[in-house]
Amino acid sequence: MSLFDHKISELKRLIHNKEISISDLVDESYKRIHEVDGKVQAFLQLDEEKARAYAKELDEALDTRDEHGLLFGMPIGIKDNIVTKDLRTTCASKILENFDPIYDATVVERLHEAEAVTIGKLNMDEFAMGSSTENSGFKKTKNPWNLETVPGGSSGGSAAAVAAGEVPFSLGSDTGGSIRQPASFCGVVGLKPTYGRVSRYGLVAFASSLDQIGPITRSVEDNAYLLQAISGVDKMDSTSANVDVPDYLSALTGDIKGLKIAVPKEYLGEGVSEEAKQSVLEALKVLESLGATWEEVSLPHSKYALATYYLLSSSEASANLARFDGIRYGYRTDNADNLIDLYKQTRSEGFGNEVKRRIMLGTFALSSGYYDAYYKKAQKVRTLIKKDFEDVFANYDVIIGPTTPTPAFKIGEKTSDPLTMYANDILTIPVNLAGVPGISVPCGFANGLPLGLQIIGKHFDESTVYRVAHAFEQATDHHKAKPEL
């Protein structure tokens, strides 16, 4: 049995009772990484020397002070688009291959305050653009459940590392499903918080109006611990919300009697596999047995979500990624005769194909003559999608459906057809456009591959999302399954 089979609350008890040390936890993490990461390929950088030194320091602090952080001694992996001082941050892109940040992201500072131990940086799709982690500029992460399948994306490294037992928890980012989709594919728990709940300061921007950092864990309880540690307003991020952060752990009561669930007919329609539908219907039976009720509803503008998302996110990306020009930091070409050539060659050589595709799409959508037809219209449709959610939430507590239309697909299966790859996020994207919170929890298997149940809540009501997810988790055994590597 791995130490990481214990929840945070149990690990903290073992540490305080001196049954294990923090150094033991960190040793367990690096031992497992050295055993299996050659197969899984989840990590891009390890911070072994510093992590071991910090673990010793915390072990000593156990005797010298009474107050300890919320995540005291807990090992964590961080997605490689979240900046970490003096620990290379590449966004899995050649253009940032040797970039060492000079500051920590706010979430990293908050992890330090909570006294978590950073193990290393995790692989991802380049600049978070992708659904399979095949767009990384450095390596392809594999799904621990079947090494021939993708772990999902863009936080594929974050989900795979947790599923493989390399770290007990990780941070990812979610722009159109990039936490929930890999969590579903890898059989772990992944939450996208409400937009503004967690500071984006130090998150390398893909689409600023959609990006949100969130936790990936083995259990709902651990997920609540992590969100507790990283949430709250931040003066360095004007989009972070000045809204009180509740005690998420107190929401895990197991009581969902009288809870009203909405199930959008669009989420169980065309393109959703029979296994995904059945796993959701089985999950609804479990929730009914616990006292909740459910009804079918409609989110009529969901069919426009994919097109809306790719216009808006690509437009924002084309602006955000303009800063990578080879002048101030990052890769710089040796093949330029003048400044214009320097920009052109640096970006052509430094960015991967998917990133270039989205920059071009976004630049086109924002260009004179097309702005009204594409970008402005997409913003209007986004408002309609947000209103659909508000209308449903006027009468229901949560919305439930599958996280993904299918389980994980084979590596290389969709790389030649971007549209089929994009369609994989069709059930997660509307949540980002509406800015509401959503979680994926394990709810079954298809052909030995995990399936995820998506639970969506009202703005800033992560507590109810956690309450439902925890009640379902406690009534089932799906989250206890582990891949064999």
From Swiss-Prot:
GO biological process: translation
One example GO MF annotation: ATP binding
Alphabetized InterPro entries for the sequence: Amidase, Amidase_CS, Amidase_dom, AS_sf, GatA
Entry keyword Ribosomal protein: no
Active site: 79, 154, 178
EC class of the enzyme, as a word: ligase
PROSITE patterns linked: AMIDASES
Catalytic activity: L-glutamyl-tRNA(Gln) + L-glutamine + ATP + H2O = L-glutaminyl-tRNA(Gln) + L-glutamate + ADP + phosphate + H(+)
Gene3D superfamilies listed in its UniProt record: Amidase signature (AS) domain
One of the record's GO cellular component terms: glutamyl-tRNA(Gln) amidotransferase complex
Leader peptide range in chain numbering: none
Enzyme nomenclature, EC number: 6.3.5.7
Subunit structure of this chain's protein: Heterotrimer of A, B and C subunits.
Family: Belongs to the amidase family. GatA subfamily.
Protein name: Glutamyl-tRNA(Gln) amidotransferase subunit A
Organism listed in the record: Bacillus licheniformis (strain ATCC 14580 / DSM 13 / JCM 2505 / CCUG 7422 / NBRC 12200 / NCIMB 9375 / NCTC 10341 / NRRL NRS-1264 / Gibson 46)
Gene (UniProt): gatA
